[in-house]
Amino acid sequence: MANRENTCNIISKMTKTIRSSFYILCLLTVTLVACDDDIFGNSQSQMVVDGWIEDGGFPTVIITRTLPITEDFVSVNNLGDYIVKWAKVTVSDGVDSVVLTGKYDNNYFPPYIYTTGRMRGKAGHTYYLTIKENDNIVRSVTTIPVNAPDVDFKVEMRSSNDSLYQITACLSDSNEQADYYQIFSRVGVNTSQYSAAFLGSLSDATLGDYAEIPVYRGKALSDSVDYTPYYHISDSVSVKIASVDEDSFHFWSDFTNNISLSSNFFLSPSNNIYSNVKGAIGCWYGMNPIEKHFVIADHK
């Protein structure tokens, strides 16, 4: 009986992984690639870059390819072929250059990353990303902002008769310079990967010197129909609010809007998503973050 239960659990996890792969690759195809009247005529697979470096952290890059929209059948079992595993990925701070090592890591999705322990991000520094795959060369540049956000948090019940809780970020910004922020959230302890929080791309041009910002749960494409942006009792929640540069802000704003504006991603808005990557789509972004961890308790 135990063996049967273990087998069912394994099959369930495999099915969830396959579905998540399908959803993510379809999103990258539908929202990152411009729509065209001849949807089958001009469809080509493109490289997608999801890379970041934060103050005090190591660079991490995930590289995939879009699933091209064609008239031919594409088996879900072949989606692993769209993870790029043999690229040469280099990060430079303008003085030193480091080649990142590709490896499998189940703490991320897709579970293959390029990283290194030989370079840490520093606030105020600029970092150059170069990706070489066959004859293709992809480049991007980002800067880690000098200042981390000045932020406090509070956790409150949504209402007196509700079992859901809301996390609020109390953000102060008295700098005269333009500042941009991105909120990420993570529920659970079995992953290292954060999701961009729902409506979590912020500019101080609209915030003023002080603002209270709801920290909504990140919305993944594999979420069920009963998704809620709030948190349940006993949820283990990690929140990251990061100062980012303007390019990163535009990318995350476009990306999260495309997800949040569509309950069915097959009918999502066809707007192109901003990218700071030359030769591919996606984003290479520097962050100066503040992280906070919560376990949601019953305050009734």
Residue ranges, per PLM feature:
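Acidic, Ala/Val/Gly-enriched low-complexity intrinsically disordered segments
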Residues: 2-5
